[in-house]
Amino acid sequence: AMPGLEADLGISKTSLGIFLTLNGVVYGLSRFVNGILADRMNARWYMAVGLALCALANFAFGFGEDVSYWITGQHDGSQFTNTMILFMGIMWVINGLLQGTGFPPCARLLTHWIPPTQLATKMSVWNTSHSIGAGLVVILCGYIMGTLGMNVSADPDAVAAMAANLGVQPGDAAGMERVMAAAAHAGAWKWCFWIPSAISFAGAVGLVVFL
């Protein structure tokens, strides 16, 4: 999704790097705080509600452009861009905060369900599932970025705006090839948040129903 955010919206790699850094810091602190809270609450509901709220925060991220327009009444310009970046940054931090509700209740439930003689093996399988899930999301998002979105490559204004966002000059053949590739799937980055969010929300419902 990051190349799409950069091409469509002009969000710099620096801003994206700040988002990721804040997300990581907040996530680490959240796991500590949520570990204390999860010991005092219903673990199943705690995990399900946390996952559902995390999915909603991710879903909201895809509406960054719309929220910025609702607030500023503008479709472009520095005020529009800054408001959008602020909203997305807040959503990303909230996402990190809510992600921290996953590990503590899982660890608590697993130690209750699994006998000590099997705990290390089952915990290893559980930990591996995180990496497998992350890998599948990367594949899914790669597919989304290459197939979804709106083709605006025939719109000279849209192409010029993307070229400016990416810092590509009209005479740069290699750079313009990158711009045209992005223009063929404008807005696809939104689906990189919406589709995984829908899957996560369905998982949260499944936790309540089947766990």
Task: List each language-model region with its residue ranges.
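Cytoplasmic helix-loop-helix junction between adjacent transmembrane helices
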Residues: 91-128
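Symmetry-related core transmembrane helices of the 12-TM Major Facilitator Superfamily/SLC fold
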Residues: 190-209
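Helix-to-loop junctions at the C-terminal end of transmembrane segments
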Residues: 30-42
